[in-house]
């Protein structure tokens, strides 16, 4: 275990909410910097755009608890809760920044407890993203992390060491996501314009998404839908693409990967390359699309335009099966607007039950929307701000029951906020 220490800048206390530290309002290239806006901050007109203002809600949804500062002093780009743990198990999350992945527990009484810190052997590594799974044989928690060097590390948290490394992407990896049901399947999106699907149990690359009609620039964000049979991706080319996994060919490859053994086979695994997405559009955003997640059959995505857009591929009445690869039309359902977030690689958080979204900005503020899946336009928004939170908020994560919200910042700080009402979401 690394000897890294974290500086606790503020111990949790029982002071009144009205103290001055907390306020609530209701209302590609290799030189590209993750702290610069890629274009003018002026928002452009979207095709089919609907103007929508979130409804203000009386009272902030979350209350400040504590924050710590990691001693590497560098940007923390990623944060992820281990939502695979049970309701009565500890609330654990990991951060990704510098060449380290740091694991914390959120005690029920408040505060943050440092559990582990993994330091990559390469001091030049910068982790951008991390994601949780577990060993199917031992049930030990596993943390996958990747970043600048383009190498995926799979870390055994209990042993605090990398047990597997995956090399295939030619450049940096911007995001990792595990399959929601088959937790040995890992998805990675890279600066090399490609997306890869891995089986970390048998150590093979099942599929590569990209090529002829793939992304034309860095892949910045990826996500599985809740059934795990579709992928959405977004990138610097301003495009959003859908890729289907429910075809006979893909299902066969996934099944084959479960039993494949490199030691027993004289041939490498027959990786499939998918050159053509099942849907693609550039009509939603006019800038880098740096975060995308599924919201039921809808998609949530954001760019450097001060709005998260909720949209659906094709017409509102169309099913996915009715979409054609040549069709780029889409329907915008709602927009969730915010202020002062015009740089790229700032990612929103969505709780596992898809009821709360949160996004930070360049001033250290966090916007929280409470969602109604049957009426996305009816979302209620509140703003969280602590006067000591002044750096760009890079990513937000929720605990399994959304009782804890955690975010990470460019000044190496990690912030914990607790839901005001005891009832879980």
From Swiss-Prot:
Basic and acidic residues composition-biased segments? 1-10
Region: Disordered, residue numbers: 1-64
Name where the WD repeats lie. 71-116, 126-165, 168-208, 214-253, 284-321, 340-379, 388-424
In this chain, composition skew of type Low complexity spans: 30-42
- The answer, when asked if Repressor is one of the entry's keywords, is yes
Question: Record's superkingdom?
Answer: Eukaryota
Query: Which is an annotated GO molecular function term of this record?
Result: nucleosome binding
Gene Ontology cellular-component terms listed: chromatin; ESC/E(Z) complex; nucleus; polytene chromosome
Parts of the chain that traverse the membrane: none
Where in or outside the cell is it found? Nucleus
Show the PANTHER family listed in the entry.
Answer: POLYCOMB PROTEIN
Q: Which family, according to UniProt? A: Belongs to the WD repeat ESC family.
> Which protein, by its recorded name, is this?
Polycomb protein esc
Annotated source species: Drosophila virilis (Fruit fly)
